[in-house]
Amino acid sequence: MCAAPKQGNTLIEVGNQTVIQGQVWHDGAPVAGAYVRLLDATDEFTAEVVTSPEGEFRFFAAPGEWKVRSLAPVGRGETTLSAGVGIHETTVKID
């Protein structure tokens, strides 16, 4: 019989990681199902995730300059940040 092993909660040590996380907002409410892209300092696409029902997203990245861009049916938005080791919170507002 072939089956995946039972899954459980996994803890990740973020003390030596660069984590970029946050929420996507539009008109004062979180945006669920928005595509969020992580672009490097040269605007090169690096990763993409879909926001949770609460509009949340998370990326594990290298330290550096980053652009976070959101694309949703209600519009698009972006923000830039400089991220070192640690957890970096950001908000992407869609106009």
Where are these regions (language model features)?
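Structured interaction patches on ligand/partner-binding surfaces of diverse proteins
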Residues: 3, 73-95
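Short, ordered, surface-exposed loop/turn motifs in non-cytosolic proteins
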Residues: 20, 26-42
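A short, solvent-exposed beta-strand micro-motif common in secreted/extracellular proteins
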Residues: 63-74
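Hydrophobic loop/turn residues within beta-sheet-rich immunoglobulin-like superfamily modules
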Residues: 60-64, 84
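Short, acidic Ser/Thr/Gly-rich low-complexity loop/linker segments typical of extracellular
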Residues: 42-56
